[in-house]
């Protein structure tokens, strides 16, 4: 068995032919640059590109296959220059009868299966070239379609206040999905504003593995959350086994941001912008008295929880708080570039490179910042209302 760093939720901004795929997303994010960034800079060994429903993205992937840069693996997924495995995914929006919208991810093994899925979904999605579009279907129906295509189905950023399963659609999985279809869900993506400790307070989620992914819309965001997975090889089939914890394949560890860094962790007044915990405010802003509140993930999970804090299934992987390197005070772009060029990828810097080497190349302040990442000593200023939290070094 081998261990790999994996980020299964990365977006393409624009195709090489100049067509926008995901708006708003950096135009620097093409299929090719995602793979190059993962390989040369990030050290992420498995990437999920979740815009492969788009024919423009399929065209770019096919071009790389024709060039010999991507090679189809025997278990599905494509190997890029023998260093990064590409898993094809599709983020799709659904809508419940009451108006709540949800984003979900469907992963498939190769271009042929993704093209088949895309052709079917084009009957529901008006512009199949753009990613994350509304399929004008309820969550249950998309689960059924994905299951018919043998896709790995994952609810995305499951608790965020906008366009997520528990954030805007339902109070329970059972209310939108019959028991017979529960096994069609391969895993649940936590999102940047939640962690394992929070999600495990909801008992019906104990049957599922959790994914911590970046949902990257720009190159520097790749790997801001990631997973360490145990696989025989970095193929689609092996990932499918790990998602379901079968045959000794598994998610070994989740590396996610402290939820307080997420931009939807706390409540936010939609009128004055105050970020605050719910407390006993009854939905009224304690600052301006406004009654329109964006409910944060922390409060939402508190509403759904049926278990006390600190309870977990015995097989739940460890969750490690990770600070994305661009968020570290005193670690500017030029300093990080120098560290990567001289000492290795970001994964190597975070997990392997001695602090003495970091200090030698970038100075004492940078070494202190990396020390804070590794031992969790940084102070966090909570985010909310669409604004990320901040890291404060002692």
Residue positions per predicted region:
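Extended substrate/RNA-proximal surfaces in nucleic-acid metabolism proteins
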Residues: 58-186
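C-terminal functional module detector
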Residues: 1-4, 15, 54-56, 63-67, ...
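Hydrophobic faces of well-ordered beta-strands that scaffold small-molecule active sites
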Residues: 6-10, 47-48, 86-90, 153-155, ...
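An N-terminally biased module of ancient metal coordination in phosphate/nucleic-acid-related enzymes
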Residues: 1-99, 356, 373, 377-379, ...
